[in-house]
Regions:
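Hinge/cleft segment of the Venus flytrap/periplasmic-binding protein
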Residues: 41, 179-183, 187, 199-202, ...
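Hydrophobic alpha-helical segments within soluble ligand-binding/sensing domains
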Residues: 90, 148-175, 225, 273-277, ...
């Protein structure tokens, strides 16, 4: 909301003249604000994502989106899929949205090819397209969206790999499991690549250490993650660490706690500060987490769509970061997490 400031009136202007000037300025400001409000009221923005409503991370993105739409007076709709990571359902949602011709479409481009057709249709209809949370890594989709707002996944994964590796035991063999939660999807593959980069640095720095790295399809359903990683731990009780590409390692933390495994015996690291993760960090079961500020990923695309329509500014890329969070920081973050803003 814009708040008009009192205009500066030179002291030499008389009272009556000052009142006239103030009235004129106030009238002009009212006129500008009325135009802005009218323009904002007509702004129609839709966010389609690849997540289901059960995905707690995405509730923070939605909150940012809703808050931004309220601030600029836009009509906003946030569209989830029924099954987490379902590209087919996301494409269907996008096609339905594009047919209605909103002013802007915000979406997560988890695949480099699946969305080309619907994005071309959106461009032909003059719809502003901004990718958020996940971007295409190659191909025509990059030219069909105007900006990306989200995390740079490979560097973020590398950071996680290096930071958790710094906690590995100083002696003895190292056995690591990397969970790729959605094989083939950009966010999971790029983060996993980054984690592998970080682990390779550890191996090069410790050429005399025996380092074993395994990868599995860990999935995104918490129960499935628990079952698959749990089965792996049964077969490999010497596992040093588990890396997750989302927040789904919270299921592994709970599993370890239920099995009475001491905190820190199996090191855990992943992404996103959902409340369950923070609780397990505080309990000592998760050692390193990488934040990507989901509230910002919902909020900023709306602002960019608003600025394009009402000011003529082109949308711009925004890196929402890769902040490293450790258990000693949990208390200071917990309040924002409970509000859904972190």
């Amino acid at each position: 909301m814009l708040i008009p400031c009192s205009p500066y009136i030179p002291r030499r202007i008389g009272t009556r003249a000052a009142l006239i000037v103030r009235s004129a300025v106030a009238l002009a400001l009212s006129f500008v604000l009325a135009i802005s409000a009218s323009a904002a009221d007509s702004l129609n923005i839709v966010f389609t994502c690849h997540a289901a409503t059960t995905n707690s991370f995405w509730q923070a993105v939605k909150l940012g989106f809703d808050d931004a739409c309220t601030r600029v007076g836009a009509k906003g709709q946030f569209s989830f899929v029924q099954k987490d990571s379902s590209i087919e359902q996301q494409v269907a949602n996008m096609e339905a949205v594009v047919a209605r011709k909103p002013d802007a479409l915000i979406t997560s481009l988890v695949d480099n090819n699946a969305f080309v057709g619907v994005l071309k249709d959106a461009k032909e209809k003059g719809i502003t397209v901004i990718s958020s949370n996940v971007d295409a890594t190659a191909g025509p989709e990059l030219a069909l969206r105007e900006a990306f707002i989200g995390q740079n996944f490979i560097p973020a994964g590398t950071t996680l790999g290096k930071r958790l590796a710094a906690l590995f035991p100083k002696e003895g063999p190292i056995h690591v499991l990397v969970g790729v939660n959605a094989p083939g999807q950009n966010w999971a593959e790029q983060r996993a690549q980054g984690v592998m980069n970080g682990l390779e640095e550890f191996k090069k720095a410790n050429p005399d250490r025996q380092v074993t790295i395994d990868k599995i399809d860990a999935r995104t359903e918490l129960a499935v993650v628990s079952d698959r990683v749990g089965a792996y731990l049964n077969a490999h009780p010497d596992t040093t660490a588990y890396f997750d590409m989302g927040y789904f390692h919270v299921a592994v933390a709970k599993l370890l706690k239920d099995r009475n495994v001491p905190p820190g015996k199996v090191l855990l690291g992943g992404f996103d500060l959902v409340p369950q993760v923070l609780e397990m960090m505080k309990a000592g079961y998760i050692q390193v987490e990488i934040d990507q500020q989901p509230y910002m990923q919902g909020f900023m695309p709306v602002m960019e769509a608003y600025l394009k329509k009402n000011v003529g500014l082109a949308p711009a890329n925004i890196d929402t970061g890769e902040a490293v969070i450790t258990p000693d920081q949990v208390d200071s973050i917990m309040a924002l997490s409970k509000e859904g803003k972190r």
